[in-house]
Amino acid sequence: MMRNKSTESTQLPNCSNSEELRIEFDSNLRRWFSRNIGVWRSRRQYFFEEEDVLNLEMFIKIEELNKNNTNGIKYQFTWWTETETDFFIKKPNYKKEGVIEASLFGHQLQKSSGYLNNSMCISNIRQVDEHELIFESSYDDWYVLEHTRLIDQDKFRSRNIYSWFKNKLKIVENQLLIWN
């Protein structure tokens, strides 16, 4: 499906229907996020700089907290693992369980913390098409680029995440999430 690029831009054209374009962009993002609600089994593969590849299986639950809020929609991301693994011994900065709250405001997702630290962060969002979003975040010397695509009528999510620390690529993460 071809999309009108002006609805995906963060800069709205100077025309009389620019508010309509903004509403379409916002509703497209809200619709995409609503397709992610539920519990997902996440199979992850981590490539760390100059280390062996590490695999991990986790669960993530995505909930919408306040559907009727006119200031933005709030989501809660809860993750956990059900199997013991040495991943968290090798990588103590990662948490085997946790919660992040996030609010969607237009083309930005404001999160209570990042995955690599406890600092609040904002991700800028670009919509590739009706199935894929790109999130771009910067916090505490980290720059994170994440591509998330819904596949096969939303039964699967594919995530590719690239993380640079002080301008050096440190982590590449591939995930396949299966809707439970």
Listing of model-derived features with the role each one plays in the protein:
Residues 3-21, 83-180:
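Calycin-type beta-barrel ligand-binding domains and close structural analogs
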Residues 1-97, 171, 180:
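Amphipathic/hydrophobic helical signal segments and adjacent flexible N-terminal regions
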